[in-house]
């Protein structure tokens, strides 16, 4: 088993997960700011 396929999966995963977490945290912060 070679790990040569890991970067091709890990890079897009980080590129999708990191912005998703950022957008989610921003939306939660904005919603809490509007409620308070």
Swiss-Prot record:
Biological role stated in the UniProt entry: May help in the organization of the PsaL subunit.
Protein name (record): Photosystem I reaction center subunit VIII
Family according to the record: Belongs to the PsaI family.
Protein topology in the membrane: Single-pass membrane protein
Sequence intervals crossing the membrane: 10-30
NCBIfam families found in the cross-reference section: PRK11877.1, PS_I_psaI
SUPFAM superfamilies linked: Subunit VIII of photosystem I reaction centre, PsaI
Disulfide bonds: none
Highest taxon, organism lineage: Eukaryota
Cited InterPro entries: PSI_PsaI (IPR001302), PSI_PsaI_sf (IPR036357)
Gene: psaI
Location of the protein in the cell: Plastid, Chloroplast thylakoid membrane
PANTHER family for the chain: PHOTOSYSTEM I REACTION CENTER SUBUNIT VIII, PTHR35775
Signal sequence region: none
């Amino acid at each position: 088993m070679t790990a040569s396929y890991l970067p091709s999966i890990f890079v897009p995963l980080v590129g999708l997960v990191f912005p998703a977490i950022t957008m989610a945290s921003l939306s939660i912060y904005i919603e809490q700011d509007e409620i308070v």
